[in-house]
Amino acid sequence: MLGEVKENNKGTKMKIIAQRSNGDIDVEFLDNYHYVFKHAKYQNFKNGSIKNPFDKTVFEKGYLGDGKFSGWANGEHTEEYEIWKGIIKRCYCEKQRDVFNSYYNISEVCDEWLNFQNFAQWYNDHKYECDGRLHIDKDIKYPGNKLYSPYHCLLVPQRINMLFSNKPNKRGLPNGIVKYKEGYLAKYAGKDLGKYPTLEEAYSIYSNAKKDVIITIANEYKNQIPEEVYTALLNYEVRIENDKNYIVA
């Protein structure tokens, strides 16, 4: 028994490094992390069911890591776990690549955040009370950014996050712009903003309208959101090149 080596169900080699009575053992995983699972059952070692927190079990990219944060509380996933799993799913879940076509194979999660412990620590350091749920945003500080990381991301209220939703369309035009024979119609928040002879003119009107709304809502939330979030909202520039639907002719 002592010194016995076997693979767990995820294919990671593990070795028995201590044994006690009644099949009570300690197991070391033989990967780069060398995590030691203490007081495992020998039967679980034999059937490969001992879990290594460094196995990439979340869409073959993310792993729980070793630390104080659990993905579960009171029989359900924690808020930080759901958000963490969600960003990995957007970027790497092949089965839902059509659902997340503006993220899959385009955006990435930084190596640091593939470890849930690191993301959970960041989340708990930055969360705050506000009206509505908190969402993670990677574009407000750095428009067009494609990396989820502690440097690039902010936690923002859901209402603010929805302002930056970039819904996919098949027109090859940025959101808020409709092509007409005479030119282009600008629309925002259900309102027609007029027709213009060029795309650039129409988008300028659209971007000004959107910027006004962003500033208005930022001021509504000023006393709820961190200064970093408020400043990022005021500094945000609505640019045509950051619209994922826009195809340069």
Where does each model-flagged region fall?
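An aromatic-rich alpha-helical recognition segment common to small helix-rich domains
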Residues: 27, 119, 177, 186, ...
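Short helix-coil boundary/hinge micro-motifs
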Residues: 1-36, 51-84, 106-109
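Extended, polar beta-sheet/loop recognition surfaces of beta-rich domains
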Residues: 41-59, 64, 160, 168, ...
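Short, cationic Gly/His-enriched loop motifs
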Residues: 68-93, 98-183
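Class I S-adenosyl-L-methionine
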Residues: 87, 205-208, 212, 219-220
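GIY-YIG-like beta-to-alpha core
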Residues: 28-45, 79-89, 195-201
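Secondary-structure transition/turn motif
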Residues: 28-33, 158, 187-191
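A short, exposed loop/beta-hairpin motif centered on an aromatic-Gly-Thr core
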Residues: 105-110, 190-200
